[in-house]
Amino acid sequence: MQETAFIWDLDGTLLDSYEAILSGIEETFGQFAIPYDKAQVREFILKFSVQDLLVQVAEERKLDVEVLNQVRAQSLAEKNAQVVLMPGARDVLAWAEESGIQQFVYTHKGDNALTILRDLGLESYFTDILTSQSGFARKPSPEAATYLLDKYQLDSEKTYYIGDRTLDVEFAQNSGIQSINFLESSYEGNHRIQALADISRFFKAER
């Protein structure tokens, strides 16, 4: 399966990090006296993104979104220890490596993602790790995928973006690559999973 490539999302896919993210947002909101509703915030960031949330709040409250971002990034960095692996994450990464599948990361997380992956002993699985600070347009723009496809001469029909949100499926579709996702989608290139262990089963069945 040498021609196969995986591009991974992190939050909610490889990393069980939403509690740490929500806690960081709560602290940030508290510093600026912004009301915090955990259920509403969770629903919003799953549908859109944390950045979209901060932009909206900054506009509503006449705040500087960059300041909000800095406070949140600092708060989140202090919560790295709360971030754990999703069930089966290490196993599927090891299986992919043993199967000759090239692996990459494209995440909306900042460079703190590198620290987390290093701390969890996962960094060596990836050929390249792109974060929100790598300079690419945010998902669902295909810019980051196009960069990886070109730089590493990847086959778009055998390259999969693995994520947990509709935004991730849209990113794969816009990029002309396959999608593996925890959600159903009308995109014919999407393959739904319920657990990370389903990925190796899917590829073994395809052989």
Tell where the protein language model's regions lie, with residue ranges.
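Short glycine- and Lys/Arg-enriched binding-loop motifs that mark or flank ligand-binding interfaces
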Residues: 8, 103, 159
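Asp-based, Mg2+/Mn2+-dependent phosphohydrolase catalytic module
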Residues: 1-4, 30, 66, 94-97, ...
